[in-house]
């Protein structure tokens, strides 16, 4: 990340900020990525708002995730991401009736096909048990919800290279130790892996 001059036009400025934010996330420096986003007085770029929300989801900052969710869902109503996050927030806030209504409307959308989301939401609302074998390729929101719902992730789950996912997985108690260690191994290039947490995870793994 250089000290290059910020581009003059608003669009170029937003593009420049996105490059810096994405680079910080790639390096695992989520605190500085979040600080950079927080410096923006009025965020009118949906991609930056999604990054901000994903960082807060990864760090379990649910109060911040839910803070402006109704505003974002209204403003960017074509993107189902905001509607799913809002349903999650409604459940966290004990607004089950609102969540069920929003979920019914979401299911009617032709381009909605997130079966994992539906399974995990049902588990959150009705405490249904889920066969972890059916949960694959989870996005960040769905993975966060498995933690809240205490759904165990299978040991054979295949990790991707997303820094936000990796640094979240190694801290998740519902993920097998072996998989958490794998996430740490994949995250070694990241800047902010706490040594104490890493040692605790490695020490809790029984070598057979």
List the model feature ranges, each with a label:
Residues 118-208:
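Long, internal scaffold/assembly segments composed of regular secondary structure
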